[in-house]
């Protein structure tokens, strides 16, 4: 759940606060939830809220444009929280964050890219008891009427998947990742994606 530095509660945050009998407002007033960019706070099983775990991620000053670097910090915190939840399904509620010289489609695309890229895990063959990423489904709720955001999210996921593919090749041992192996991977990509 995205939280700005403003101490006022509105939108989804107000609904969650009312459902929790004022818990969120108390935590904000005690500055346990600050809203500072990238700051993340974990709360287990908030009374009145139908979620096993909740993470509050700071989005900075309300109604103020932020830099791309700050937005990347927010996306990284959201992605880290989603994976740390160890849940199969995650709901992300974020306010519309305004980034300098960027539109809403770009912000959604970057979030999709971070979520996908952060899910990467390298599995070394032969090593037992390797941790597995259990996250299978992510739903994003955003207060925006802009059209085409699902396409922007999909684009971000595709870029993130490409990044993960590159990481997998880079992490493959040199005795396996030979020129022949790379050529086979390239051929497989061209068979799967006609534009490659």
Model-derived segments and spans:
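Short amphipathic alpha-helical segment within the helicase RecA-like ATPase core
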Residues: 1-196
